[in-house]
Protein backbone atom coordinates (compact mmCIF):
# COMPACT_ATOMS: atom_id res chain seq x y z
CA UNK A 1 0.00 0.00 0.00
CA UNK A 2 1.41 3.38 -0.97
CA UNK A 3 0.46 6.83 0.19
CA UNK A 4 -0.16 9.79 -1.99
CA UNK A 5 0.88 13.37 -1.45
CA UNK A 6 -2.58 14.51 -0.30
CA UNK A 7 -2.88 11.71 2.29
CA UNK A 8 0.48 12.68 3.71
CA UNK A 9 -0.42 16.38 3.74
CA UNK A 10 -3.65 15.55 5.55
CA UNK A 11 -1.76 13.50 8.13
CA UNK A 12 0.78 16.28 8.65
CA UNK A 13 -2.11 18.70 9.23
CA UNK A 14 -3.75 16.32 11.73
CA UNK A 15 -0.44 16.11 13.60
CA UNK A 16 -0.11 19.90 13.75
CA UNK A 17 -3.73 20.32 14.80
CA UNK A 18 -3.35 17.74 17.57
CA UNK A 19 -0.06 19.22 18.73
CA UNK A 20 -1.61 22.68 18.91
CA UNK A 21 -4.76 21.47 20.69
CA UNK A 22 -2.78 19.50 23.28
CA UNK A 23 -0.35 22.33 23.90
CA UNK A 24 -3.09 24.94 24.26
CA UNK A 25 -5.16 22.66 26.49
CA UNK A 26 -2.20 21.83 28.70
CA UNK A 27 -0.99 25.40 29.17
CA UNK A 28 -4.27 27.34 28.98
CA UNK A 29 -6.55 24.90 30.78
CA UNK A 30 -4.88 22.08 32.70
CA UNK A 31 -2.24 24.22 34.40
CA UNK A 32 -4.87 26.85 35.23
CA UNK A 33 -7.44 24.40 36.65
CA UNK A 34 -5.03 22.18 38.55
CA UNK A 35 -6.12 19.09 40.46
CA UNK A 36 -6.45 15.97 38.32
CA UNK A 37 -5.57 18.09 35.28
CA UNK A 38 -1.98 18.40 36.51
CA UNK A 39 -1.42 14.86 37.75
CA UNK A 40 2.04 13.75 36.71
CA UNK A 41 1.02 10.91 34.37
CA UNK A 42 -1.55 13.05 32.55
CA UNK A 43 0.89 15.92 32.01
CA UNK A 44 3.55 13.49 30.79
CA UNK A 45 1.10 11.96 28.30
CA UNK A 46 0.14 15.38 26.99
CA UNK A 47 3.81 16.34 26.60
CA UNK A 48 4.48 12.99 24.91
CA UNK A 49 1.62 13.64 22.50
CA UNK A 50 2.85 17.15 21.68
CA UNK A 51 6.33 15.79 20.94
CA UNK A 52 5.14 12.70 19.03
CA UNK A 53 2.95 14.83 16.77
CA UNK A 54 5.80 17.25 16.09
CA UNK A 55 8.18 14.37 15.33
CA UNK A 56 5.77 12.54 13.03
CA UNK A 57 5.00 15.76 11.14
CA UNK A 58 8.71 16.53 10.81
CA UNK A 59 9.50 13.03 9.47
CA UNK A 60 6.72 13.27 6.89
CA UNK A 61 7.69 16.81 5.88
CA UNK A 62 11.27 15.65 5.28
CA UNK A 63 10.06 12.62 3.34
CA UNK A 64 11.93 10.34 5.71
CA UNK A 65 11.79 6.64 4.84
CA UNK A 66 11.15 6.05 8.56
CA UNK A 67 7.98 8.15 8.70
CA UNK A 68 5.79 5.04 8.88
CA UNK A 69 7.47 4.04 12.15
CA UNK A 70 7.09 7.47 13.71
CA UNK A 71 3.47 7.67 12.56
CA UNK A 72 2.67 4.29 14.11
CA UNK A 73 4.24 5.40 17.40
CA UNK A 74 2.43 8.73 17.23
CA UNK A 75 -0.89 6.92 16.83
CA UNK A 76 -0.26 4.93 20.02
CA UNK A 77 0.72 8.04 21.97
CA UNK A 78 -2.31 9.99 20.71
CA UNK A 79 -4.66 7.16 21.73
CA UNK A 80 -3.17 7.08 25.23
CA UNK A 81 -3.47 10.86 25.52
CA UNK A 82 -7.10 10.76 24.32
CA UNK A 83 -7.95 8.16 26.96
CA UNK A 84 -6.34 10.27 29.68
CA UNK A 85 -8.20 13.39 28.56
CA UNK A 86 -11.50 11.50 28.48
CA UNK A 87 -10.95 10.20 32.02
CA UNK A 88 -10.54 13.76 33.26
CA UNK A 89 -13.63 14.96 31.43
CA UNK A 90 -14.98 18.41 30.64
CA UNK A 91 -15.46 20.27 27.37
CA UNK A 92 -11.82 21.34 26.91
CA UNK A 93 -10.56 17.82 27.55
CA UNK A 94 -13.17 16.40 25.17
CA UNK A 95 -11.92 18.68 22.38
CA UNK A 96 -8.36 17.60 23.07
CA UNK A 97 -9.33 13.92 23.07
CA UNK A 98 -11.14 14.36 19.74
CA UNK A 99 -8.06 15.97 18.16
CA UNK A 100 -5.93 13.12 19.50
CA UNK A 101 -8.28 10.49 18.06
CA UNK A 102 -8.35 12.16 14.63
CA UNK A 103 -4.56 12.29 14.60
CA UNK A 104 -4.28 8.70 15.82
CA UNK A 105 -6.55 7.49 13.03
CA UNK A 106 -4.63 9.39 10.36
CA UNK A 107 -1.23 8.33 11.71
CA UNK A 108 -2.32 4.71 12.06
CA UNK A 109 -3.22 4.66 8.36
CA UNK A 110 0.04 6.39 7.43
CA UNK A 111 1.94 3.91 9.60
CA UNK A 112 0.56 1.04 7.50
CA UNK A 113 1.74 2.56 4.24
CA UNK A 114 5.06 2.27 2.51
CA UNK A 115 6.71 5.10 0.64
CA UNK A 116 6.04 5.03 -3.07
CA UNK A 117 9.15 4.33 -5.12
Region annotations inferred by a language model:
Residues 1-117:
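Amphipathic alpha-helical hairpins
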Amino acid sequence: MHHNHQEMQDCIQQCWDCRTECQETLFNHCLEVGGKHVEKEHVKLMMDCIQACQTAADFMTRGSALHTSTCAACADVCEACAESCERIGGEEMKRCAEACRRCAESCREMGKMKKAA
